[in-house]
From Swiss-Prot:
Active site: 237 (proton donor)
Protein name, entry field: Methylthioribose-1-phosphate isomerase 1
Listed pathway(s): Amino-acid biosynthesis; L-methionine biosynthesis via salvage pathway; L-methionine from S-methyl-5-thio-alpha-D-ribose 1-phosphate: step 1/6
Enzyme class: isomerase
GO BP annotations listed: L-methionine salvage from methylthioadenosine
Pfam families found in the cross-reference section: IF-2B
Name of the gene encoding the protein in the UniProt record: mtnA1
Amino acid sequence: MNFKTLTMQWTGNSLILVDQRKLPHVVNYVECKSYAEVARAIKDMVVRGAPAIGATAAFGYVLGAKEAATLKNQNFIDVMKNVYDVLASTRPTAVNLFWALNRMEKCVDLSKAVDEILEDLEKEAIKIAEEDIRINKTIGTHGQTLLKDGCAVLTHCNAGALATVDYGTALGVIRAAVESGKKIKVYVDETRPYLQGARLTAWELLEIGVETILITDNMAGWVMKQGKIDAVIVGADRIAANGDVANKIGTYSVAVLSNQHGIPFYVAAPTSTIDIKIKNGSEIPIEERSHDEVTHVHGVKVAPDGVAVYNPAFDVTEHQLITAIITEKGILRPPYKENIAKLFGG
């Protein structure tokens, strides 16, 4: 069984990922032949974006199961628990990682032969990947109704095809609007320190012919004040039960600025990103990454020796700042706690 998109390719025995650290000027691929290599690729941000991480982890789980099946002197379930733990430890904030791993774990039927288990797991991983594409396109269909023809949108980080299995969430909304015949202009925050906006989002948008204007993160407020922005759309790595949203660091600042200037602030994400076990944003674990990401830019040191660094990869935007959350099941509006509960049958 094979599967291929821009972000990833499953060969049946390995997972090939486009190396997002090298884009846009170099297109390299990293082939992962074991679950440990998949875990390293997630941790090192070869692949990033909550939905993409989830699907990648699912294929990593398959590779782990294939490896476990060859270990004659070890209990299959014990090995798979370790596979789960290794993959789950890679990126603590993105809930899609745990959602996908839990789904894969539930797929293991010990009443079946190992070969059947492996086949079931491979089918489930491909199903997760294929579902993500359909979900993203549905998010786009719902979300594009919020964008008027000729409007200008600001986005932060990268929530496009590269952050998902394909099509994208926030960029999927923009893409769907363009496909419906609307003319959309997009302002892209560069998104320090990893520059996902400059390197990935700008590249994706230009590839599909969208008018794209790159700005530094500290320009967003001034651009809003000048009346250049009609809406803001971002993705999400985890959404709490009350509607608080964890997303790439800098999202909170953009939300505050949007609120100050009366600009609608939209979040686009699949329902798998909603963690109903988390009451509010204060309970969401925030990953901290290497100091080198702040002190260096593309390997060039820009900060003095000995300077202290704080590098949280995500921040939390309170639900009061969010105009709507766009999901595959429709557009959620306040009160989020009640409407999210209804979405999950509460």
